[in-house]
Amino acid sequence: MKNSLYENCNLCPRNCGVNRFEKTGFCGETSEIKIACGTLHFGEEPPVTALGGSGTIFLTGCNLRCAFCQNYQISQKGMGKTLSADEFADLCLSLESNGAENVNLVTGSHHIPAIAEGLERAKVKGLKIPVCWNSSAYENIEALELLDGLVDIWLPDMKTLNPMISDEVFKAKDYPKVAKKAIRWMMEHSTLKFETVAEKNDKDSVKRHGSSQIEKMISGVIIRHLVLPGRIDDTRLVLDWLKNHADGKACISLMSQYTPVEVSEKDFSKEEIESREKSLQSFQHRLMNQNEFDEIRNLIDEYNFEYLFYQELTSDTDWLPDFNKFQPFSNELSKTIWHWNGER
């Protein structure tokens, strides 16, 4: 039984060996799947958002626990509600019935056995839309294999290939090695496939996408990289690897949205805040500036990837979520279908 893997948990490279039927692992979670919210999200890459929005399920807990995480309320502070496999399946179906283009599972690496069971039940109940796996790529291949045949779209991060940064920021010096292996596996198990879809309400589509038609992803891999301010050379390392190993096999998504998230002793203990601040000294904890963005644009031209998305530079922070609220994101970015603190 898949869930027996929780007894001596080695699902992720932390290999903490905890019996998660009895207590929490490094990820902060037990064997029970916990979810913060389910939304129609319109802020993902265009082929994932498509026209109806991505049916995004934000899971509680995380096996990486980055010091700069914008979702710290759910990734590190345990906010969420426990769901059974059938309840999880019903949430997937609810997102589909509300027009979601896919089911987008955010940060579920530590819940893979329970998620696999839930997805199997959802498909038996009639789930037809693609399933998207949205993760840090800090994952063991043995765990990912449980998702083979259940996931259609892989959306991993490649956060850094600098072991010093990964050690200092998320206490995982082996992250570069692990992420490369996981992403290679994802590319081997999914082929890029798109279909053209047209919006009946042309005005809404043109406003959001600039066109009444869009290419929707059916399967494949999109590899994300968040540029850290002051560490453009690290981004070049990542792009070098991606050019050599992923160009033409996956889409590349460069993100410029790094945003300082302020926390207080209401959120974390004094010791946790001190540890967090020490980790953040590895780079410049600020918004990206125009010079850095220009450098990124030059790198985009230099590497000339076959499939690449990038974010425009902005100082807007309205997109930062608050998972205490029924609508964690702005109304423009998402529509909540289910929330841990009550349905509406």
Task: Give the positions of each predicted feature.
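Conserved Radical SAM active-site core
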Residues: 23, 27-149, 153-154, 162-163, ...
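Hydrophobic faces of well-ordered beta-strands that scaffold small-molecule active sites
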Residues: 55, 103, 131-133, 154-156, ...
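Conserved radical SAM core fold
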Residues: 75, 112, 137-140, 158-176, ...
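Alpha-helix N-cap and loop-to-helix initiation/capping positions
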Residues: 83, 110, 170-178, 230, ...
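Aromatic/hydrophobic pocket-lining residues that form the small-molecule binding cavity
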Residues: 88, 115, 144, 179, ...
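Alpha-helix-loop-beta-strand connector modules within alpha/beta enzyme cores
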Residues: 118-132, 181-189, 292-298
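Glycine-rich S-adenosyl-L-methionine
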Residues: 173-191, 203
